[in-house]
Amino acid sequence: MLKFIGGVAAGVVLTGALGYGMADKLMFNETMSPFGVEETVARIQHNIQAAGNGWTLSGLRNPARAVQADGGNTLPVMMVEACSTKYSKPILNEDSVRFLSILMPCKISVYKKNDGKVYIGTMNAGLMGKMFGPLVGEVMGQVAADQKKFLEMDPKKPAPPMIVPKAGGEGGGSGGGGGSNC
Amino acid sequence: MRKLFATVALLAAQALPCAWAATDPAPAPGPAPAAKPASKSTADHTKFKELQQAFKSGPEVTKACLACHTEAGKQITHTKHWTWEWMNPENKQVLGKKHVVNNFCTAVPSNYEFCTACHVGYGWKDANFDFKNETNVDCLVCHDTTGGYKKLPGLAGHPAYKEMEFPPKSGKMVKPADLAKVAQNVGPTSRATCGACHFLGGGGDAVKHGDLDTSLKNPGKYLDVHMDAKGLNFTCAACHATQGHNIPGSRYTPTAADKEAAHMRGKKDDTNAATCQSCHGQKPHKATGVRAKLNEHTDKLACQTCHIPQYARAQPTKMSWDWSTAGKLKDGKPFTVKDSGGHDAYDSKKGDFRYESHVIPEYVWLNGKVKYTLLGDPVNENGVTKINEFFGSPDDGASRIWPVKVFRGKQPYDLESKSLLVPHTAAGYGVRDDTAFWQNFQWEGALQAGAEAAGRPFGGKFGFVATEMTWPITHMVAPKEDALTCTQCHSKSGRLQNVKGIYLPGRDANPWLDLLGGLAALGTLLGVIAHGALRIYMNRKAG
Amino acid sequence: MSTKTIKIYVFKRFERFWHWAQAGLIVFMMLTGFEIHGAYAFFGFEKAVGYHTVAAWSLITLWVFAIFWHFTTGEWKQYIPTLEKVGAMMRYYLTGIFTNAPHPFRQTTLRKHNPLQRLAYLFFLLVISPVIWFSGWFYLFYGAWREWGVDKYLSLEWVAFFHTAGAFMVLIFFIAHIYLATAGHTPTSHIKAMLTGWEEVEEEESAATK
């Protein structure tokens, strides 16, 4: 009996440890891009604009700039920000999950690593949504499905221009970007 | 703080038709522009009678300069900047801009009027230029401090003397230089004057070198710790310490391994003054402990290998150029295609390009010996022709591992002689020229004219061959905090994974030893486990 | 088997300190060393090198004290090899140990190591140690090779080869050593002895030799 309980306890601890170790891989996603940083950003931006469901670009951040301004270097990193009121409104209207506004707008990060290759980092919106009940779970599930479409890139299509927000835009770099701020 | 995030780089650099010598004002030295800062010079050129005249041309200014600086003209005429010709004493190859072929705009000879916008002289429009005439020396292009002096491609090294449309048919007007004002405000060279040519090499800003572009006119500390405009603010000549107009530091014979101590005043030292070691010496790392180990790397690594982790960190540089697609027309007209960052991806005049920023260099052994593929030399039709081959080996004691930019391209060659061809691309300003590729987009005529100008035969049939040109990376030195970390090389798939001939701990291991040792250790482990299990089993049986 | 045991004092205070300090350092050096070798990433290369170097100097210091101690106390004689009873020891490990046969070696304060141990430790001292110390020394002072005039005769590849070979030998020694620590009078008696200094041995024989 003792052995059985011990076994179960060990199993729980092991699973917990495994889950803890893999949480980052579950919550976040990293894929390689066949294109350069700017082209990857541009293709994602144009996918977002073509995705429908109210999606608009709400900004393009470049945190590497801040590091440079401080006299240091980091490899290029750009964050494409997108927003859809269709998805943000129901969450923002529900007091119990309003704090999830910290996850808004939806972000996709494009960056280069020391191997010289370009990667795309995304949040696993579907899985994360499930942690906050059925309402958020459903909305985030739809966001996740749309997000998948943002990353579909056809190399046969010519590279679109990157959409750069106007300098000095409201919200510290998350300026217009061709869409409304939400 | 907001401002830091405020803008994403608007990568605005526009590729110019070809190197366009343009000087911008040197960065203001102080916060108070009202009062001119006290000059350390002993001469105020505004007070010189010789310079108070209405100059009509560059050579007139030079004549005035030479009246006092009697030896300057002679000095210049002995430099590569003037002759565009230099013989490598090692292998007797005759190099210099006049002779080498590259895989950018390829070659000078049929395009003198255009290319000599970057010559330190006036009037080099064909092979008959008088290299003896010192009044043809252009003093202003290097010594201008006003930023108001521009040499335009197509004018054979002259600036505009009257208002003119440039580029032709662009609708943009260029005002003539105020030669008297420029002449009265001469001073030491600056990043802007050197950069007027060297930042724009290869046909536009940031095209050629990767570690030299217009972002170095006014760089932040992140980009170059020495040239940092708000910090050390080095000019080019701070390192390329020039004597008698002879500038040290050339990639034709790079100093791959400077084994000398730091240069000291009074001590005779004829070695290259532009190396890192010429200031920092042989043991540059002051640290103790494990970091002291860094000094032991200097027998294998160039300083640049760790201290320039990436190049083109402010704006992208051109990485490849495929001439074979040049000449496509849309509705009979040339066109350009931009990439996502707004840089040229295609130009009917030139072909396909690829730009990249924050480029991770490639790494090669270099001992300072370089061999060029010149006109007439055979190309490698089935593989890659090396425009310039860098020599070096881990065992010769003279080589160091260097970061390089490898510029890849495709360019025309003669199917008969199997050697490179050079197209005649640009004509003089306003000249209608049917053989110029950039006017007619016809290869045959352009290659024929190019071959004639270069004094080479052309069989009439041509193809395109893959070429590589290697550029040592030595500028854009990052702050020391941004140097490579140990693991970036000391790991299996690190920066130096392709560099052969050294044992690199963390990357290399003897596979047989690892296999044998691993198996022996595993065997021992399994052995004692089995032994222990048997003991427990027997014990239980007995007990 | 013998029903009565007595305790004898085998390992003196310094000896125990030496053993455990050395054990810790060697384990730590294996951990950092195999990381430098590229087997895994844990501390990161730079830190691993730093720690490995500090541990090496600590171990050298410890050895200087230990050698001094061995010679002043005469304990070095414990490592004089003997072939007496080696066969019996091997037979014991191969068969006797499973049937609880009596241990063929009677431990005393003057003869604390069994003949196989003596051989193993001597092997460690005469083969493994020189291999790992000499190769390690040249590895550490790579930057001084030219000054020493040895750069013509050495290559880092071979220095690293021998150092790695030594490391594998240490690893194997370590595995066997840990296991054999459980092969005393009782599975824990050796370990207790190394911790407290007092070893349990069978009564009548040890009494006789005392």
Go through the PLM ranges and name each one.
Chain B
Residues M1-L4:
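Positively charged n-region of N-terminal signal peptides that target proteins for export
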Residues T7-A15:
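Bacterial N-terminal signal peptides
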Residues A21-N133, L140-S190, A196-A273, Q277-N295, ...:
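Sequence context of c-type cytochrome heme-c attachment sites
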Residues A302-T305, P309-Q310:
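A conserved active-site cap/scaffold subdomain adjacent to cofactor or substrate pockets
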